Amino acid sequence: MRCWLTPLLFLLSFPSIAQQFELNPADYYSFEPVFTKPYITHNRIKTIRAAIVYKRDNEAIEDKGLSKYWEYDSAGLLNRYYMTSVRGYISREVQHPAVFRKGKRIFPPSVSYEPVYAYDTTFTTYYYNRQKQIIIRRSRDGDYYNTVYYEYDGDGNVEKQSTFRETNASENKNLFRLGVQNLLSKEEFRYERISSTQMRRQHMNDEGKEYKQTLFHYDNQGRMTEENNSFTVSWMRASLKLDYDNNGRIHEKLFTSNENGDETAKSEYKYTADNLVDVEKRYKGDQLFYEYNYIYDRQSRMLTSHFVREDLNKAIVIVRYTYEYY
């Protein structure tokens, strides 16, 4: 199911200052909000740090030192992002001095080893053109970089997208100078306005042949209500439907796919009296998988933390946010 969801970010955006993050995560199983540009610029945010801990029912909080970090420029554009993940365990040497009692050594110096977490950190850097559109997204994972290059048409739609595996030829690893570059994939997109409420996007492979088609539906207020995806040479289909409440807020998202049999995933939203997302429930089929609860500062109304209840694992993911400002 996950491979269908990434393209949804192309055209979905809800730029309300009251709404601090978009209700369209690129990954249905992601535990992070996608902060909106109006939220960043309105509050003059420079950096956001997220500290992540995990707690199983009837157990103490487990802090593995996991974190995420977003860095923005003064125009609200995301410049850098990184996240840490646990790679495994390593042994750390611990030196123990000799033990003396009444001037007499009763235990000699010793060495012991204790397990500690080993981390992987993925860094992503973003580059923009004069129209403030992303043209390069470069992610470093170890010695290699996965880089996506974007080109746009006159209407601001992504027209070409190329993904490369790259190396850094610079001796200073904090500076990037292109070394070896290998093409991994290349796509082109063509757009057709069918009517005032419908638009079609064709996905072309590196041979210029259409392999996928996306049809977007909008209401009379310009809000997207449905997205249908279909592959040209296979039976696979997927759709996303958005339902809005009387205040124009997303009330429900429904995702369906036949990629692995008939699958459905649904998100339901409740809001505070201040028009902020309060609770989000995510279902797979009829089973509740995750329940999000969002906590805000009473005075600034900024997001301070959110809790993700994993119903099947009987556990909670706790994410706390801290900010730096311009």
Where are these regions (language model features)?
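Bacterial Sec-dependent N-terminal signal peptides
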Residues: M1-L23
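Buried hydrophobic residues that stabilize the cores of well-folded domains
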Residues: Q19-Y326
